[in-house]
């Protein structure tokens, strides 16, 4: 795939993720938008790693670490949201002020 196509697709995914993070009021939707942002970054890492030096796999290895962190976030994030929903009866971001009891 050509560099321009990957960059356009990655910018599109990143923009959707940022827009979703800014406008979403639901924690689950915010986690999904964060995953979109991380996937857009991974696409850039892999494509630029292939473009500049295809023999060294620095971008590929770094993207594997980002995927591992995203997997941990995907495992822990819904558990935290479930706990907040159980205690606060809402998953809306603007209603969950955890500093006040």
Curated annotation (Swiss-Prot):
Keyword set, alphabetical order: Chloroplast, Membrane, NAD, NADP, Plastid, Plastoquinone, Quinone, Thylakoid, Translocase, Transmembrane, Transmembrane helix, Transport
Superkingdom of the organism of origin: Eukaryota
Topology within the bilayer: Multi-pass membrane protein
Protein EC: 7.1.1.-
GO CC terms in record: chloroplast thylakoid membrane; NADH dehydrogenase complex
Reaction catalysis annotation: a plastoquinone + NADH + (n+1) H(+)(in) = a plastoquinol + NAD(+) + n H(+)(out); a plastoquinone + NADPH + (n+1) H(+)(in) = a plastoquinol + NADP(+) + n H(+)(out)
One Pfam family of this chain: Oxidored_q2
GO BP annotation list: ATP synthesis coupled electron transport; photosynthesis, light reaction
Localization per record: Plastid, Chloroplast thylakoid membrane
Major site of localization recorded for this protein: plastid
Single GO MF descriptor: oxidoreductase activity, acting on NAD(P)H, quinone or similar compound as acceptor
Transmembrane segments: 2-22, 27-46, 61-81
Annotated S-S bridges: none
Known function: NDH shuttles electrons from NAD(P)H:plastoquinone, via FMN and iron-sulfur (Fe-S) centers, to quinones in the photosynthetic chain and possibly in a chloroplast respiratory chain. The immediate electron acceptor for the enzyme in this species is believed to be plastoquinone. Couples the redox reaction to proton translocation, and thus conserves the redox energy in a proton gradient.
Annotated family: Belongs to the complex I subunit 4L family.
Complex and partners: NDH is composed of at least 16 different subunits, 5 of which are encoded in the nucleus.
Protein name, per record: NAD(P)H-quinone oxidoreductase subunit 4L, chloroplastic
Native source organism of the sequence: Drimys granadensis
Classification of source organism: Eukaryota, Viridiplantae, Streptophyta, Embryophyta, Tracheophyta
Name of the coding gene: ndhE
